[in-house]
Amino acid sequence: MDRYQALFAKLAEKNQGAFVPFVTIGDPNPELSYEIMDTLVKAGADALELGIPFSDPLADGPTIQGANIRALNSKTTPIVCFDLIAKIRAKYPETPIGLLVYANLVFANGIDTFYTKCQQAGVDSVLIADVPTNESEEFRTSAIKHNVHPIFIAPPSASDETLETVAKLGGGYTYLLSRAGVTGAETKAGMPVAQLLARLNQFDAPPAILGFGISEPAQVEEAIKAGAAGAISGSATVKIIEQHQDNPAALLDALTAFTSAMKAATQK
């Protein structure tokens, strides 16, 4: 059983959904970034979704773009990122770790090299934001070869054909978009998702985790009630880092409070 399967099985026993925060590795700097990831898991995050800083994050709104800029300014390279992931993996052997990246980063040193590094660092899944299913074969083949789940996005407007492909090609979990557009807590998640979940389930897709615009416990509760296996919160998590970047103690306290509240909302 891989880490995602083990997590979903454990949560099912407890009658809970998964809470998965997203942060950009190296934001605001590599040292504090490690503390942030450690704090998120300690405060109750079921899995981590991590970004490798990139100069042109197309799918992201201003909050996560800011995180990328801070991380790049503090000299966070992919090598630094993989080192930090390996450190978190060593401390938390069972916590699933997913990466959310852009294709250019994967191409930079060769696709196989990228997935080899993922495997060595203990990464469980990779979602490439700008690679749709019909262009994914090369990435997917390499991911599977290195025991990394390829994650695909199920958009709210998807046809049955798209959902079937996402279900067939994906592993680990399915990233369910609550609405179209770029990421951001400023724009509320556009529920309801029950209908989309029902369609995904008929194609036997990996468990669906809802993302985009999830910033408060009530939305997590709603997502779980609608049948999602969990909720991902990116911009709201990153906003806390942005607000407290100059005061590490306040930052870690605020992240602990936020994560605990979001996790509590996953109880069915």
Curated annotation (Swiss-Prot):
Active site, renumbered: 49 (proton acceptor), 60 (proton acceptor)
Domain of life: Bacteria
Enzyme class: lyase
EC number: 4.2.1.20
GO MF annotation terms: tryptophan synthase activity
Keywords, sorted A to Z: Amino-acid biosynthesis, Aromatic amino acid biosynthesis, Lyase, Tryptophan biosynthesis
InterPro entries: Aldolase_TIM, RibuloseP-bd_barrel, Trp_synthase_alpha_AS, Trp_synthase_suA
UniProt keyword annotation of Iron-sulfur present: no
Reaction(s) catalysed (UniProt annotation): (1S,2R)-1-C-(indol-3-yl)glycerol 3-phosphate + L-serine = D-glyceraldehyde 3-phosphate + L-tryptophan + H2O
Entries under SUPFAM superfamilies matching the protein: Ribulose-phoshate binding barrel (SSF51366)
Recorded metabolic or biological pathway in which this protein acts: Amino-acid biosynthesis; L-tryptophan biosynthesis; L-tryptophan from chorismate: step 5/5
Record-linked Pfam families: Trp_syntA
GO cellular component, one term: cytosol
Signal peptide extent: none
UniProt subunit comment: Tetramer of two alpha and two beta chains.
Alphabetized NCBIfam families for the sequence: trpA
Family according to the record: Belongs to the TrpA family.
Known role: The alpha subunit is responsible for the aldol cleavage of indoleglycerol phosphate to indole and glyceraldehyde 3-phosphate.
Name of this protein: Tryptophan synthase alpha chain
Source species taxonomy: Bacteria, Pseudomonadati, Pseudomonadota, Gammaproteobacteria, Vibrionales
GN (gene name): trpA
